[in-house]
Design a protein with these regions (language model features):
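Residue-identity detector for glycine
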Residues: 5, 9-10, 19, 30
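HhH-family (HhH-GPD) DNA N-glycosylase catalytic core used in base-excision repair
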Residues: 21-225
Length: 225
């Protein structure tokens, strides 16, 4: 989520390249029948458009899926989210489909394997953060804590429904993201600065930041439990 030159903890980021944190603007892609959508996916990249139309902002309640997204957002620090999106399947293959039981057991041979894998973002610090995060995830589970419940508690279990008319109103963080970031860091998670965390919250539907003019705003709002 963070642009080049930001701090390694991911607390500073450009909102237009910050993971799934996107300052949405309404865009019509040039076709009369095209839906009105946020501008950040552009109008030509099918992968990006599908991510916006099908995934971004949809409430996610599965603990393992949430952990995967948090790990990927950490790997995105310093890069554009589309880079990670294009490598997502390679990441899943490299990290045993983000099975925390397996990732938590990774040793030096696995670290070397991952650092040699050109299909993913190769960073010792980020790889170590993923392995460490898997261990924390399992510790929480073994102590009777559900990861999804832990995260959703920061928004009282319900998505924050924003109604932004334009890009300038969309924030890069929030009090809830600040609190979640602080709690994740206290647990030992890495690459979880408040800007990264807010992007994570947007992407996983804890916050609905599709602009009110985007065709996905209403459907995403209706998905809230």
């Amino acid at each position: 989520m963070d642009p080049p030159g930001s701090d390694v903890g991911g607390s500073i980021a450009d909102p237009l390249t910050a993971g799934s944190l996107f300052a949405c603007r309404v865009l019509r892609d040039g076709m009369d029948t095209a839906p009105t959508r946020c501008t950040w996916p552009g109008a030509t990249d099918a992968l990006y458009l599908a991510y916006h139309d099908e995934e971004w902002g949809v409430p996610e309640y599965d603990s393992r899926a949430l952990w995967e997204k948090l790990v990927l957002d950490g790997f995105q620090a310093g890069l554009a989210w589309i880079t990670i999106l294009r490598k997502r399947e390679a990441f899943r293959a490299a990290f045993d489909d983000f099975d925390p039981e397996k990732v938590a057991l990774y040793g030096e041979a696995d670290r070397a394997r991952l650092m040699a894998d050109a299909g993913i973002v190769r960073s010792n610090a980020k790889i170590d953060a993923a392995i460490g995060g898997a261990k924390i995830f399992l510790e929480m589970r073994d102590n009777g804590e559900d990861f999804a419940d832990f995260l959703w508690a920061f928004v009282d279990g319900k998505p924050v429904q924003n109604v932004w008319p334009g890009t300038g109103q969309v924030p890069v963080t929030s009090p809830e993201a600040e609190a979640m970031s602080k709690a994740l860091k206290k647990r030992g998670f890495k690459f979880v600065g408040p800007v990264i965390v807010y992007a994570f919250m947007q992407a996983t539907g804890m916050v609905n930041d599709h602009l009110e003019g985007c065709f996905r705003h209403g459907p995403v709002r209706a998905m809230a439990r």
